[in-house]
Amino acid sequence: MTYQNGVEVLLEEFLDYLTKEETICSLEIEKLKVSIDELEKETDEPRVLQGINYFRTAKEVYQLSRKAYETKEEVVSEALILWIYENLWKGFNVPKGYRKSDMVIFGAKFSPPPPYVVPNLIRTIVNWLRNEKTIDVVKKSIIFHTLFEVIHPFPDGNGRVGRILLNAILVENGLLNVAFRNREKYISALREAEEGAIVVVEKLSRGRKIDYSSITETVEYYGNLNVFDELIRTEMMHSLKVYSNIKQVFLTPEEAAKLLGLKNKDYVRVLIHRGKLKAVKEEGKWKIPLSEVVKNFEHKLKGEEFKLANNLFKGKLSPS
């Protein structure tokens, strides 16, 4: 068994595998099937080329996001969004840039805003992303994703662009990109979460000024983000479980807290001291095996909630 430290190991060594899996799952959401082997081909067959374009585009974006994680920079920008769209449709006769006409989405609860407001809306949500510092990264990625999908800025491929951006936000903040393996669960989670985004986009489209904190509060108030949050963490833990069977990686309390969705590292220390999370201490610092983090998350999904962490959050316990 090989032992290594830190989430950055996962980002570096597991990225190719995860991005291939993500590509297959992301296209299956749109009922387009490609195989892992086909992603390595050179072809102009439209079905396969869409998969190749997604894989190559996503991988390059996540490599940029990984570097941004190391340098504490921000990778998501309007220029990146336009670049992703253009590269997803490389080799196809698809218009560049934002859509130039109104759009109707079959089965949606909303109508995307008129094309003339799209550029300003995209700049607004990018600025929101850069200025929002009060919520955890998974919730942040969900809010951005729902806002982007409601804006629906492009003639086609909005779901693909949006999922790459969601994952770029996760990777930029030290987490892994996720593959949504169940189409129905993804669509259901998106529908539950998007209610607040619909309210925000409608207000912004009418010229209303909304500050960044109000955007967050509105999306959280009207939309149910919890289902989407749990789906992302479940998919991430699925991937981590596969990886932990190959290689043993130790995480810091901060990294473990981020993966588990806990408020801060003190919650992790409480779980360690109470024997709920196995860890080792070296040179005065706790190191938690990735496999233990996965195990605890699985217990949580089965209904064995993190009662100690919740009690700490309510002020009933103090960290050791």
UniProtKB/Swiss-Prot annotation:
SUPFAM superfamilies: Fic-like. Pfam families: Fic, HTH_17. InterPro entries: Fido (IPR003812), Fido-like_dom_sf (IPR036597), Fido_containing (IPR040198), HTH_17 (IPR041657), SinI_DNA-bd (IPR010093). Residues 76-206 form the Fido domain. It catalyses: L-tyrosyl-[protein] + ATP = O-(5'-adenylyl)-L-tyrosyl-[protein] + diphosphate; L-threonyl-[protein] + ATP = 3-O-(5'-adenylyl)-L-threonyl-[protein] + diphosphate. ATP binds at residues 100-101, 157-159, 163. Its EC number is 2.7.7.108. Keywords: ATP-binding, Nucleotide-binding, Nucleotidyltransferase, Plasmid, Transferase. PROSITE patterns: FIDO. One of its GO terms (molecular function) is DNA binding. Coiled coil: none annotated. Belongs to the fic family. Probable adenylyltransferase that mediates the addition of adenosine 5'-monophosphate (AMP) to specific residues of target proteins. This is Probable protein adenylyltransferase aq_aa38. It comes from Aquifex aeolicus (strain VF5). The lineage of its organism: Bacteria, Pseudomonadati, Aquificota, Aquificia, Aquificales.
